[in-house]
Amino acid sequence: YRDAKITTIYEGTNEIQRVVIASHLIGRLGKSSGGESRSAAKKPAPITGIRKRTIFREGDAAQQVNDLVAALKKDGHDFSVGIPMDTPIPKAERVVSAGKGIGEKKNMKLVEGLAKATGAAIGSSRPVAETLKYLPLDRYVGMSGQKFTGNLYIACGISGATQHLKGIKDASTIVAINKNGNAPIFKNCDYGIVGDVMEILPLLTAALDSGEKQPAPP
């Protein structure tokens, strides 16, 4: 068989070889009636499921931020209430996360400011916690880290690696801010702004800052 896998097994010092042939059937779909493979006929769905994928492009950065805030409020997000930034990720209803696009550690203050204005807990991608060590390991979100299932996730400078997207696939609303318009996160978000986090985050923080937050209902 062309698709067979041949495994050589050595037994003891005599190196007696046995050939085991196993057909590779997983992932090999039959042909459709039209002659095209089913896998080619149907594109894979986004990792985070069906999303709005609304990217705000009109006007300058300030207008894009205002359009984003208006959309979030229209969806029912109330920014007069909030949770502590150190709330455990699995228990948080809102999370603002930093990716490597945040740059130097001093720029984490922008993420913290947005988390406070949003009334959200703070999180990160795996490299930010594990490699850069900007946050403790229990703050990174992903398949091998914390799972977020709350109502609002804001990804700041996160490109959208598969393992990260699988950690947020059950979020109600995903917002992406990244200067790379081709980043996978934009195919897996509800709302997005293609822009530099250094410019967008201060604008978004100012737009959402409604003063002291009331405790979010349990």
Label each PLM-derived region with a short phrase.
Residues Y1-S39:
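Glycine-rich phosphate/cofactor-binding loops in nucleotide/flavin-utilizing enzymes
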Residues K31-P218:
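N-terminal glycine-rich FAD/FM-binding segment characteristic of electron-transfer flavoproteins
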